[in-house]
Amino acid sequence: MPTLLYLHGFNSSPESKKALQTEQWFANYAPDIEFVCPQLPPFANQAMALLSRLIEQRLPDPVYLVGSSMGGFLATCLVERYGLKAVLINPAVSPHRGLEDWLGENANYQTGETWRFEPEHIDEYKQWDPTAIK
C-alpha cells in the first residue's frame, strides 16, 4: 500500500490545521493511500531516526512525503537519502541559521510537551543540511 508521510513544522504537531486538512483530503479522495503524520521531536537526529524507521518499514512500497516548514527541510534530507518524491510547503532552508531564538526551555504550543534546546541541537540541523539535491 502506498504511504503519504506528512511532516509538520518545528514545534508543531499532527494536530496542526494543515496536517488535519491533508489527512481529511486523503481519507475522502485517496483512501487507498496510508496517511501517516508522526509527532516529530524538535531535534534533527531524533526526527530523522524516527522518519527513517517509518520509511524503511514501508519500503519497497511507495512512500511519498509532504513537508511543511521544518518538515520540508526534513523531507529534503529524506529525498536525498531514499530517492523519494516530496511536496514541500514553505520549506525551511539551512534552518540552523535561525534556531538560536529557541535555545533554552520551550513548550509545544499544541501538545504542551516541554523540551530544552541546546547549541548541540542547532549543530544537528547544520549536519543534516543537504549540499546537493539530486
Region spans (language model):
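Aromatic pocket-lining residues of Rossmann-like dinucleotide-binding sites
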Residues: 78-82
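Short, glycine/serine-rich, charged loops/turns that create anion-binding
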Residues: 11, 70, 93
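The alpha/beta-hydrolase serine catalytic core
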Residues: 84-134
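Active-site catalytic motif of lipid deacylating hydrolases and related acyltransferases
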Residues: 2-60
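A generic local structural motif
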Residues: 49-54, 73, 122-131
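Gly/Ala-rich beta-loop-alpha elbow adjacent to hydrolase catalytic centers
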Residues: 65-75
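Structural motif
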Residues: 3, 62-64, 85
